[in-house]
Amino acid sequence: MNAAAEAEFNILLATDSYKVTHYKQYPPNTSKVYSYFECREKKTENSKVRKVKYEETVFYGLQYILNKYLKGKVVTKEKIQEAKEVYREHFQDDVFNERGWNYILEKYDGHLPIEVKAVPEGSVIPRGNVLFTVENTDPECYWLTNWIETILVQSWYPITVATNSREQKKILAKYLLETSGNLDGLEYKLHDFGYRGVSSQETAGIGASAHLVNFKGTDTVAGIALIKKYYGTKDPVPGYSVPAAEHSTITAWGKDHEKDAFEHIVTQFSSVPVSVVSDSYDIYNACEKIWGEDLRHLIVSRSTEAPLIIRPDSGNPLDTVLKVLDILGKKFPVTENSKGYKLLPPYLRVIQGDGVDINTLQEIVEGMKQKKWSIENVSFGSGGALLQKLTRDLLNCSFKCSYVVTNGLGVNVFKDPVADPNKRSKKGRLSLHRTPAGNFVTLEEGKGDLEEYGHDLLHTVFKNGKVTKSYSFDEVRKNAQLNIEQDVAPH
């Protein structure tokens, strides 16, 4: 985004319409509104509905929002004027809080008198715990806390992508360990194919970065710049890719020249891994005849560092992977690893990048295990399912007011709708703690002030227009590691 486009962002216009009218709705003499964000627990979910439980979430992406949209001088005379005009037309009435915004402009030079406290980025926290809190630091600006709910709750997206990606990593880790005895290459087992499947460039950057919290393979280039700009890494880049064919680079040779296309591409990329989509006409013929016979001599001469990666891209994902492995297993020398599972030679691998979501992934690796194929043989690509087939409802991401000060008196507030106990919200000032047993617990009603519970895991990350604490992407990744990764030392 260039500087001109960035300057156009107006926080006064980045809220739900109804919030423009809320400053008139709070009790008179309200001086503080304190709200919090959580991924609510579903206590009454029908267990048959959803295969994956999502019992814990990866907290990621707030740092990006704070830095891109909320820090610094975000209120100007021009932006107030612009908002005033838009809302006059939008509501057909003068409901806009011009006085309140002018106060922020004059008293704070357009910096937001808000404090945000949050759990460290990359933290893995069970559902139903507080993840961040927001409160006004100036009693005149009680209305500002929930004005910024809209933009802050958009953190649901990176949180959900990172969480779903990590749940898939758990599946891959479990089956890789069971079928090979180690976790080598785990971080390259799920590759991001989602750039074209998301709704915008910004979505691509945010979503790709969230997947890279857990993995290192991506074709969504937008994630790299976002991480470098808003998080930073010790490595030159946080994500990697390899040369790969698409259908056009095969079909452009004509139907009778698929072998020539394959030969040309593997020769062009002889010393690095290369992925070749092989289902333009007949995936099984391609594996058996072209790769297994006609071009076999070119494949067996490749090094371990530069395998051919055959990519099927149609049909039932499980059936296709098993049949491809079966054909390749008859055409190339297969060995048995220490766990008793079949392994293709190191110069040959398979990537399944079609129809992969968290449910089909589980089915494919389970099916492979049953047929005694090691997960070492394959990797996966996921696009729309990884970055777009997600909503705020998946983890029940919610922002609610829990504490207000009116007439100088603090009051613990909550909602508890009669028709849905899942929507009950927490009360009072909140803090997050670890019990001696290592479990997370959210304390309500300011009870975290008592020393017996240990220190609060929520840290101030934003105060009065300044980002006060930041996390590097390396820290985020370390926080989000699987327990199994810490237990199994890499070879």
Curated annotation (Swiss-Prot):
Pathway in which this enzyme or protein is active: Cofactor biosynthesis; NAD(+) biosynthesis; nicotinamide D-ribonucleotide from 5-phospho-alpha-D-ribose 1-diphosphate and nicotinamide: step 1/1
Expression (tissue specificity): Ubiquitously expressed in lymphoid and non-lymphoid tissues.
GO terms for cellular component: cell junction; cytoplasm; cytosol; extracellular space; mitochondrial matrix; nuclear speck
Family: Belongs to the NAPRTase family.
Inducing stimuli: Expression shows a diurnal pattern of oscillation across the 24-hour light-dark cycle in liver, with a reduction in levels before the onset of the dark period (at protein level). Expression shows a diurnal pattern of oscillation in white adipose tissue (WAT), peaking at the beginning of the dark period. Up-regulated during polyclonal immune responses.
Species for this entry: Mus musculus (Mouse)
Recorded superkingdom: Eukaryota
Subcellular location: Nucleus; Cytoplasm; Secreted
Documented EC number(s): 2.4.2.12
Function: The secreted form behaves both as a cytokine with immunomodulating properties and an adipokine with anti-diabetic properties, it has no enzymatic activity, partly because of lack of activation by ATP, which has a low level in extracellular space and plasma. Catalyzes the condensation of nicotinamide with 5-phosphoribosyl-1-pyrophosphate to yield nicotinamide mononucleotide, an intermediate in the biosynthesis of NAD. It is the rate limiting component in the mammalian NAD biosynthesis pathway. Plays a role in the modulation of circadian clock function.
Protein's UniProt name: Nicotinamide phosphoribosyltransferase
Keyword RNA-binding: no
Keywords: Acetylation, Biological rhythms, Cytokine, Cytoplasm, Glycosyltransferase, Nucleus, Phosphoprotein, Pyridine nucleotide biosynthesis, Secreted, Transferase
Recorded name of the encoding gene: Nampt
